[in-house]
Amino acid sequence: MFGALIKKLVGSKNERELKRMWPIVERINQLEPELVKLSDEELRGKTAQFKERYSRGESLDSMLPEAFAVCREAGKRVLGMRHFDVQLIGGMVLHSGKIAEMKTGEGKTLVATLPSYLNGISGRGVHVVTVNDYLAKRDSDWMGRIHKFLGLSVGVIVHGLEDYERREAYAADITYGTNNEFGFDYLRDNMKFDLSEYVQRPFNFAVVDEVDSILIDEARTPLIISGPTEDSTDKYYIIDRIIPLLKKGEVIEVEANTLSGKRKTYTGDFTVDEKAKSASLTEEGVLKVEKLLKIENLYDPRNMEILHHTQQALRAHALFKRDVDYVVRDNEVLIVDEFTGRLMPGRRWSDGLHQAIEAKEGAKIENENQTLATITFQNYFRMYEKLSGMTGTADTEAEEFHKIYKLDVVVIPTNRPLLRPDFPDVIYKTEREKFNAVIGEIKELHEKGQPILVGTISIEKSEELSELLKRQGIPHFVLNAKQHEKEAEIVAQAGRKGMVTIATNMAGRGTDIVLGGNPDGLARQEFNGTPETRTEEFMAAFIETLSKDLPEKELLQSLEREYPGIMPVVAACLKQGGEIDLEELERQVLAEHQKQFNLLVDKNKPVCAAEHDEVVALGGLHILGTERHESRRIDNQLRGRSGRQGDPGSSRFYLSLQDDLLRIFGSERVSMIMDKLGIEEGEAITHGLITRAIENAQKKVEAHNFEIRKHLIEYDDVMNKQREVIYTQRKEILGGNEIRESFTGMMEEAVGDIVAAYVIDRTPAREWDWQGITDTVQKVFGFHLDLTPDLMDRITPVNFDETLRTTARERFQQRLTEFGDDLMDHLIKVIMLQVIDAQWKDHLLSIDHLKEGIGLRGYGQKDPKQEYKREAYKLFMDMMLRIREEVVEKIFWVQVGSEEEMEQFELEQPQQRMVFNLVDEEAAAPAQAPSKSKRSAGRNDPCPCGSGQKYKKCCGK
C-alpha cells in the first residue's frame, strides 16, 4: 500500500529514467536546424571533430547530443529515415549499458546506429550482435551506409570468412556479426600460436539485438570447439535395437505405512518424466535390458557406459519427436531450435544423445567429440567493458538480466499508441476441437480479406494445420524450418490482403510485417533478387559468355534475354575498345540495376498504400496462436508482430487440454475447473480462472528454466576463472616478454613441488622417500643426486631446497649455452604452448566427468555445488603442477637435430592455424538441459594442440 503511494507520487523507476532523458532529446532536436544547412562534406567532417575532442579527453557522454543529432541527419540523407524522439531515448539507453525494450516495428535496427556511431568515435570497436548471418549481413549493408557516410569503417563477421577477412572486419570501427561467430572467434584466437594471428581486439562495447534470444534462450548452450574420439559407433545400434522391446509404464501412488502415507510403485520397463525431460528404467526394465544385452549386472561399474547409453536411447525414443525436436534430411539428424523453429545445421546434442537419435532414425552415426575449448554466452558477453541490448520482450525476464548480467531493462514508449486488442484465450478439451475452431476462424477472416499470421510450436503442427487448410481450399504459406530459405520474403508480405501465413514460433523475427505489403519485398520478387545479387549473377554470366569468344552481337543477344535493359551499358563499355574494365562495368551495371529496381519500388508504392488502407479498415493483421509456449515472452513476441507503428491488429490464442504446456504442467487444475463448469465436447471456455492457471503454469516453467540457467552459470563461473588464468598465461607467452623469466619461475616452482611432495618437516632426512626424490629429480631435471651418508646427516628441508634450486639453475645455464638465447626462447615458447594446450584439453575432459557425477554427492548430505568448486580447484592445481613438471622436463631433455629438422619444427606452429579452415560448422545444442554446441577438428586435420601431427596420431589417440 505504502509502496504504491510512493510510486504514484514519484513515478516508477522506468518513468524516472525516461523523465531524465527527455531534456537531452530536446537538446538534440534544437541542433537539427543547424545541421540541415550543412553540406554532406561538412556533416561528415563532424566525425573528425568528435574524434579530435575524444583524443583530448572529452567524454562520449558530453558529445552524445551532438553525435546523435549528426547520426539522425545522416540517416535522413542516406536512408530517408529520421530517428523518432523515442528512438533517440532507445539509443541513450543502449549507450548507458542497459536493455531497451521496444515493441515490434519501432525501428530497433535504426536505433542501434546511434550508440554505435557515438562509441565508434573512440576507435576501440563496437560489436553489433544479431541472431543469424542474414540479419548481420543485411544490417551491415543497410545501416552501415550511415556509418560509412559519416566516415566510420564497417565490418561484418559471417560464417565461412578467412582469418584475414575476420581481422579486417574486427579492426573496423563498427562490426556486425552473430553471437556464435563472435564466441567461436574468441575460442579460436586462444588456441593460436602467434599473437599476430589473433583476429579480435579487446572487448569494448556490444549492442545485442534480440538480446532475450541470445542471453536467455541460448544461455544453456555452451560454445565448444572439439575433436573426435576413436570410439566405435556399433554400441548405439546395438542398444537402439532393444528399446522398442521395452514397455512404457506409469508411476502409481499406493497407500503405505510411511510418513506421507503413500508409496510410489512403477509398472512396465521404463517411466517417462516429461517435466524433467528424463526417462528411467524400472527394476523389471533393468532385468530385461540385462537379458537382452546378455550382461550380468547393468549397474556394475564396468557397465556404466552401457547404462548411460541405454538411458540416452530411452530419451531419444520417448522424449524426442521427429519434425518437432529435429528433422531428418539427407541421412542427417538436424536439430530444430525450440525458440525460433529454425533448423540448426552442424549443431549436436551432447553426451551421446545425438548419436542415440541417429541410431533411432537409421541415419549415419557421427562419433562423439572431446572438448578442446569452451565458453558459455553468459561468460563471453560479460567480458565486454560495456554491454547493452534491445528486444521487443525483455520485461518478463528483467530480474534475470539484472542478476546475471547486471543489466537493467528500460521500457521505451511506442511512437504511436498501441491499437491491438489481445483477446482472451479460448480453451477446448481436445486438440481436434481446437483445430476445428482455428480453421473456422481462419476461414471467416480470410473470406473478408483480413491477413492472418498463425503461430504453431512445431513443424509437425504447422504441417498438420496446413493439411486442414488445403482441405478447406484456403491458400496459405507455411514458414517452418523446412521452408526457411524464403523466410524474410514470406514474412514481409504476411500483411497483404487475404494472406494466411503459418509460422513456427518466431520464424522471421527481425523482419517487419507491413500492412498492405512491402514495396521493397514485392520489387525483389519481380526483380528476382536485389540489385546487388542480380549484378553478381550478371557478372558471372558475362565472364562465362566472354570465354566462348562470340561476336559482339551474339554476345549481347545471349545476355539480353536474361538481363533486359543492361545491354546498352555493356555495349558502351565494349565500344571503348581495348580491354574491358570489369570493375567499371560492374559499377555501371549495378547503377542500372538499382535504377530498374527503384522503378519497381515506385510502381508498388501506390499499390501497397491503397492495400494498406483496405487492410486497416478490415482490422489489420490478426495473430492466431494455436498453442501457448512455455515462456510468456515467446507468446508476447508472436503477438508483437501485429499492431506495429500504431497500425490496428488483434490477437487470440486457441488452446486445448492436450497441449504440451497444459498436459505437463497444468492440466489437472484446468480440467477440474472445466468439469465443474460442465463444459461439453466442442464447447469452448474463456474464463479468468483458466487464464490465471495457464499463466501460473508458464511462470512455473520460467522459474524452472531460470534455475537451470543460474545453476549453469554458477558452475561455469568456476571454469571461467580457470579459463582466464590459462588464456592470460598463453597471451603472455605469445607476447614473448620475459619468457625466460616465466620458465625460470616454473622451474623454481617445480623444485618447490618436489620438496613439498617428499620432504617432511621435523623428520630426519634418512627417513625421507629418497627413491622417489632421486627418480623425480632425474626425470624432471635430468641430473642425478649423489647422496653420501655424511651428506644425509647434514641435510635439512631448507638447505635441500636451496641445493636443488642452485643445481637446477646451473643445469639450465648449461642448456642455455648449448642452444643459445634465441633458440632457447623459441623452444620455451613452443613447448609451453603445446603442454598448456594438451593439459587444458585433458582438464576439460576431467571437468566434464566431474560435472556428470557431482549431483550424486547430494545423496551423501553434501552440497554438490561446493563439492564441485572444491574438486574443480583441486583438478586445476593438479593440472598446473603437471604443466610445470612437463615443461621443465621437456626443456631439460629436448634434443635439437639438423637444420632440416629445425625448419620442420618451425613449420609446426602455422599448421595450428590450418585447423580452423577445415572445421565443420559450429554446433550449439539447443536448450535441452545443459547441452553443448560443438565445432570439430577432423581425424586427419592438423592437431589443434599445435604438435604438427595429424589429430588421430596425437591428441585424438
UniProtKB/Swiss-Prot annotation:
One of its GO terms (cellular component) is cell envelope Sec protein transport complex. Zn(2+) binds at C943, C945, C954, C955. It holds the Pfam family SEC-C. Residues 924-957 are annotated as: Disordered. GO terms for biological process: intracellular protein transmembrane transport; protein import; protein targeting; protein transport by the Sec complex. Its cofactor is Zn(2+). CDD domains: DEXDc_SecA, SF2_C_secA. ATP binds at Q87, G105, E106, G107, K108, T109, D512. It is found in: Cell inner membrane; Cytoplasm. It catalyses: ATP + H2O + cellular proteinSide 1 = ADP + phosphate + cellular proteinSide 2. InterPro entries: Helicase_ATP-bd, P-loop_NTPase, SEC_C_motif, SecA, SecA_CS, SecA_DEAD, SecA_motor_DEAD, SecA_preprotein_X-link_dom. Part of the Sec protein translocase complex. Interacts with the SecYEG preprotein conducting channel. Has a central role in coupling the hydrolysis of ATP to the transfer of proteins into and across the cell membrane, serving as an ATP-driven molecular motor driving the stepwise translocation of polypeptide chains across the membrane. HAMAP family: SecA (MF_01382). PANTHER family: CHLOROPLAST PROTEIN-TRANSPORTING ATPASE (PTHR30612:SF0), SECA INNER MEMBRANE COMPONENT OF SEC PROTEIN SECRETION SYSTEM (PTHR30612). This is Protein translocase subunit SecA. It comes from Geobacter sp. (strain M21).
